[in-house]
Amino acid sequence: MNDPILHLIGLTPPIVVALAFALPLLSLVVKSRSIVEGYGVVGSLIAMILSVLTFYYTYFIKSPIVYTFGAWPPPIGIVYEVDRFNALLGLVVGVVFFLVAIYSIEYLEGREGIEWYYTLLLGMEAGMLGVLYTGDVFNLFVMLEVTSVTAYGLVAFYRSRKESIEAALKYALVGSVATTIYFIALALIYGSYGTLNMAQIALKTTSSVDYFFFILGGDKLWAVYTPALAVAGAAALALALWAFSVKAALFPNHFWLPDAHPAAPSPISAILSGLLVKVGVYAIARFTYTLFHAAQLSMLIDVALRNAVEALLIILIVLGSLSALVAGLLMMVQTDIKRLIAYSTIMHIGYIAIGLGLATKLGLEAALYHTINHAVAKALLFLAAGVFIHVAGTRSIDELSGMGRVMPLTTISFVIAAFSLAGLPPFNGFVSKYLLYTALIDKGLAPLTLIIVISSAFALLAYSKIIYGVWLKAPTRSLEGVHDPTWKMSVPLLILAILCVVLGLASPYIIEKLITPAIIDLAYNTSDYIKEAFNILASILGGR
C-alpha cells in the first residue's frame, strides 16, 4: 500500500480521535464559541472526506484494502480491512455525522459545554468508523467501547436533567454487560482459534482450507482443525450475537433504547437511532457471514458448526419478527414524539434482523439497503422533530398542535421521513421493505410478510397521529414569531429529504452498483477478504 491516500484511509479513526482530543485543549485557549463549533464541523467534514475516499477506492479497486498498524502484518498486528460492505456503511456514517454537526450549531445555541459536545461527537464518529473498518475482533471490542462511552456522555449532555442522567446510567449499565459478554466470546475465540484476526478466523472455520494456502519460507500456512473448535466456535458466535443484539436494540434486548434516545439532544438522537444501533447490525453481519460463512454453510468445516449457525439464523428471524410487532404496537400508544420515534427504531432493526436471518442474497440486499434507508430517514425524522421541540420547548405531541402550518419545510421533511419509514412509495423505505417482502416469499416464508404489513400499518397510524397534530389540529399556543429555522438546521433537513427520494427513485441503479457488490464482499467472496490479509503477510516475509 504505497499510495499516501490509502494511508490516510487507514488512519481515518485515529485522525478523528486526535481531532476530538485536541478540542478541549483548544477551548482553553480560544474562547470563541463560533470557532469551537467550526472546529467540530470541520472535523466531521474531514472524516466525511476520508470516508468518501475509502468508498471510492474500494469500489474502484474492487478488492479489500488492508492497512497495517506499525507495519505489523496480520495475524500478529492489528489491521484495518475495508471491503465494499463496510466502506458503503462508512460513507453513510460520514455524511450523516457531518449534517448533524451543522444542525447542532443552531440547535444547541446558548447551551454551555459545546466543546465537550463536539469532542464526544467526534469521538463517537471515530469509534463508529473504527468498528466498521477494523479487521481484528479485539480491536472491534475497543472501538465498541469508544463508541459506547461517548454515547453515554452525549445521552447525559443535559446533565441538569434527572431524566438524562438516569437514561445514561441505564444505558451504560446495559452496554457494559453487553461488552463484557462479548469479551468472554473473544476469550473463547482466541483460546480455540489462536487468533483475533478476522481473516484468519474466517480461514479456520472453512472446510476449503487447502484452497487458501500461502507459501512462507517453504511451508504452508493453514488452519488446524479439532472437533472442539465447532463447540467453541458456536458458543463464541452465540455470545457475540447476544452482545451485538444489545447494541442493536433487538428484542428482547431493546429495553434501554426508549429511555436513552429521547433523553439525548435531538441531533444525538438522530445519530443514536440512525447510526449507532447499526454498529450492532454490522457486527452481527460480519461475524455471521464473513467469519462463519452463513451464506455458504457448506464451506464450514464441521456439521455441528453448520447446525449451530443455522439455528442462530432462525433465532435472528424470530427475534426480528417480535421486534417489529412489539415495537409497532408500542409506537401507537406514545405521547412523547421522541419516544415514539425511538420505538420505530426497534421495529426497523427487526426488519433488518429478518433479512440477515434469511441468509439469501436477496435477503441480505434487503437488510443492507434498509440499514442505509433507515439511517437516512430516521436521521431526518429526529432532526425534523428536533426543530419542533427546539421551538416549542416540549416533546409532547399534543403541545405541538398546529406548528406545522407555519413551519412548512420542517413539516414536509417530517412527512417525507415518516412516509419513508412507513414504507410508502416512492420513498426509499418502500423499496427495501419490498425487497424484504420478496425475499421472504422466495425463501418460502410468505406468512412472515404479514409481519411487515401489520407493523408498517401500526407505524403509519402512529406517524399519522403526529402529522395530524402538527399540521391539521388547532394550535394550543400562540404561533406568532414561529417559523422554519435558519439554514444551519434547514439545509441538513433538505439534503436528507432529497436523499429519501433519490434512494427510492434511483433504487435499481443503487442496488445494482452499490448494494449487490457490498453483499458479495460480505457473504459470497470471503476468499478475497482472507487473501488480501495474508497477501500483506506474504509480501512482508518474502511470501508467494
Q: Residues of each region from the PLM?
A:
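Cytoplasmic/organellar membrane-interface segments at the starts of transmembrane helices
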Residues: A264-S266, M407-P408, S456, L460, ...
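Membrane-interfacial helical/loop segments at transmembrane boundaries in membrane proteins
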Residues: I65-P74, N197-V224, Q296-L305, K513-R544
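Helix-to-loop transition at the C-terminal end of transmembrane segments
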Residues: T54-P64, Y190-T195, S507-E512
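Hydrophobic transmembrane alpha-helices and their helix-loop junctions in integral membrane proteins
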Residues: L99-L108, E125-F138, Y152-Y468
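Transmembrane helix-loop-helix hairpins at membrane boundaries of multipass inner-membrane proteins
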Residues: M1-I15, A22-T119, Q200, I515-N525, ...
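Short phosphate-coordinating micro-motif centered on Lys-Gly-acidic
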Residues: E145
